[in-house]
């Protein structure tokens, strides 16, 4: 993937606040197993809700392969908290307001589109911080969780 993170690349550690405002690091999640990081453009929009709810609905399948799910968007901590409460998410939503982490992963759009400046992409990351799979689909919201599970052997 040009200008971003691709399969086989090693991901740098990062820290962002979760929906409670607590700072969370990628390395913290990786200590417990592989991590599925999914980027979504904007909380509480139709597509992002469908994508995020599918990750929620597959909690048992992700647990069976020892993987954790982490959602990231440019929404504020407060908006992430409301999104999580409304849909009962059982995984953290990280707030990347300045788009720094999105840019590091290569999912930040070139055009300034506000909250929609982030591409909908998913990265499956092994405990060695190496990317095992990348999923990119703007239209098939279920593809992200489904393909991530396949990459993890689920």
Give the location of each predicted region.
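Chalcogenol-based redox active-site neighborhoods
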Residues: 1-154
């Amino acid at each position: 993937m040009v200008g971003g993170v691709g399969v086989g690349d090693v991901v740098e550690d990062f820290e962002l606040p979760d929906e409670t405002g607590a700072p969370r690091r990628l390395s913290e999640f990786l200590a417990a197993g592989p991590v599925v990081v999914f980027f979504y453009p904007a909380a509480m929009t139709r597509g992002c809700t469908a994508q995020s709810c599918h990750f929620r609905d597959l909690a048992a399948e992700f647990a069976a392969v020892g993987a954790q799910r982490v959602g990231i968007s440019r929404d504020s901590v407060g908006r992430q908290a409301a999104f999580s409460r409304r849909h009962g998410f059982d995984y953290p939503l990280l707030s990347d307001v300045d788009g720094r982490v999105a840019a590091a992963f290569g999912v930040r759009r070139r055009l300034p589109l506000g909250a929609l400046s982030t591409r909908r992409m998913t990265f499956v990351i092994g405990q060695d911080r190496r990317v095992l799979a990348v999923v990119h689909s703007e239209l098939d919201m279920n593809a992200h969780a489904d393909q991530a599970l396949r990459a993890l052997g689920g």
